[in-house]
């Protein structure tokens, strides 16, 4: 094995199911401290966060990652124990190897190598880690970003190690993410016998026209590299289970993934107005997961395009697809944000894995990005 493999395996062996860190950050802080970084442990609620810096002043480049993982599911479904890293046929298996302990290990190795070669580098190189990315994402980077605002901590560039690649390492550069807004709609009716509909008010029938209008609406035509805003109904529930009872209440869960054309308050107002037009007796609860962010052409994006193109052998696709990431909390600080990481084909799945060759290449990729941004 080599250093990044050893470190990745050490991290996988720590069963840090969100929001647990299981000692990952202490291990990483020990290495970063030995390399000359100043490390600050931020315990917020039940969540561990680590802020490590080397150098001072601008520009500030942050390597952003998380040490928590999603639950592995049934252990018997895995070919080997999810927290016992195994290499088979040139592939490393284990929960979190792709999302994103491999990237975190590569960050640390790259940071160690960079500061060893450039002790007096310009600006600040920082590593920010949390154990609350896969869970509620309340006491992790969201709260740390608020703390940075209070401190006046500026961030110029942020590289998140989310698994962005699709087929081969470096084939995709994530330059933004859509916003995410979830709603839970409760429509009230009057329960009754199906044989006497005039004595009841069926909330399914009452809500159907409004729901049809919601799902048929074209919210926008997309933006730059963003696909159009999408509303998806994810759950509908009503009734007692008996086929002779008109339900007294309908519950509908839905989610919007939206472009920078919108923000959460405007979407909430649009949907509330639509429901009001249909004269429904309803209650609506919202959950804002994050606003969209987009990194336009600039130094970070151009450098990343060149570096990934050299590693992958072709210019990367530049995309804003996928789910949310913690970069959504860093972008509002004024930072340009990108995501660069390993192939994402197996994330959150049984037998999560990364090619060993890709993992071995990651530190050099990250180090090259750091050098291009802080040295040139």
Swiss-Prot record:
Transmembrane feature ranges: none
Reactions catalysed according to its record: N-succinyl-(2S,6S)-2,6-diaminopimelate + H2O = (2S,6S)-2,6-diaminopimelate + succinate
One GO BP: L-arginine biosynthetic process
Residues that hold Zn(2+) 1 according to the record: 66, 99, 162
GO MF assignments: acetylornithine deacetylase activity; cobalt ion binding; succinyl-diaminopimelate desuccinylase activity; zinc ion binding
Organism from which the protein derives: Xanthomonas oryzae pv. oryzae (strain KACC10331 / KXO85)
Subunit structure and binding partners: Homodimer.
Pfam families linked: M20_dimer, Peptidase_M20
Function in brief: Catalyzes the hydrolysis of N-succinyl-L,L-diaminopimelic acid (SDAP), forming succinate and LL-2,6-diaminopimelate (DAP), an intermediate involved in the bacterial biosynthesis of lysine and meso-diaminopimelic acid, an essential component of bacterial cell walls.
Protein name: Succinyl-diaminopimelate desuccinylase
EC number, as in UniProt: 3.5.1.18
Residues holding Zn(2+) 2: 99, 134, 348
Keywords, comma-separated and alphabetical: Amino-acid biosynthesis, Cobalt, Diaminopimelate biosynthesis, Hydrolase, Lysine biosynthesis, Metal-binding, Zinc
Pathway of action: Amino-acid biosynthesis; L-lysine biosynthesis via DAP pathway; LL-2,6-diaminopimelate from (S)-tetrahydrodipicolinate (succinylase route): step 3/3
Cofactors demanded by this protein: Zn(2+); Co(2+)
Cofactor: binding details: Binds 2 Zn(2+) or Co(2+) ions per subunit.
Originating gene: dapE
């Amino acid at each position: 094995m080599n250093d990044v493999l050893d470190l990745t395996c050490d991290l996988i062996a720590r069963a840090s199911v969100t929001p647990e860190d299981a000692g990952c950050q202490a291990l990483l802080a020990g290495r970063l401290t030995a390399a000359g970084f100043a490390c600050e442990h931020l315990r917020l609620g039940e969540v561990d966060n680590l802020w490590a810096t080397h150098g001072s002043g601008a520009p500030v480049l942050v390597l952003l990652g998380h040490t928590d993982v999603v639950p592995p599911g049934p252990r018997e479904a895995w070919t080997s124990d999810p927290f016992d890293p195994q290499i088979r046929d040139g592939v490393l298996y284990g929960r979190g190897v792709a999302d994103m302990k491999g990237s975190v290990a590569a960050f640390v190795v790259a940071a160690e190598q960079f500061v060893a070669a450039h002790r007096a580098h310009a600006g600040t190189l920082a590593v920010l880690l949390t154990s609350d990315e896969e869970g509620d994402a309340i006491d992790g980077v969201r709260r740390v970003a608020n703390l940075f605002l209070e401190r006046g901590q500026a961030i110029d560039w942020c590289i998140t190690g989310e698994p962005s690649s699709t087929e081969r390492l470096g084939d995709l550069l994530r330059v933004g993410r859509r916003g995410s807004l979830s709603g839970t709609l409760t429509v009230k009716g009057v329960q009754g016998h199906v044989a006497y509909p005039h004595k009841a008010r069926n909330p399914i029938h009452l809500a159907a026209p409004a729901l049809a209008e919601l799902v048929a609406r074209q919210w926008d035509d997309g933006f730059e590299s963003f696909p159009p805003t999408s509303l998806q109904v994810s759950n509908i529930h009503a009734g007692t289970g008996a086929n002779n009872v008109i339900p007294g209440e309908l519950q509908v869960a839905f989610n919007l993934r939206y472009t920078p054309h919108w923000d959460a308050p405007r979407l909430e107002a649009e949907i509330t107005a639509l429901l009001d037009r249909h004269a429904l007796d309803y209650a609506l609860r919202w959950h804002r997961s994050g606003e969209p962010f987009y990194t336009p052409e600039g130094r970070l994006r151009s450098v990343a395009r060149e570096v990934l193109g050299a590693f992958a052998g072709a210019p990367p696709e530049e995309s804003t697809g996928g789910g949310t990431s913690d970069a959504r909390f860093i972008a509002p600080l004024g930072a340009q944000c990108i995501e660069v990481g390993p192939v994402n084909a197996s994330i959150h799945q049984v037998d999560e894995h990364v090619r060993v060759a890709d993992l071995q290449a990651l530190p050099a990729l990250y180090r090259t990005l750091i050098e291009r941004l802080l040295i040139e």
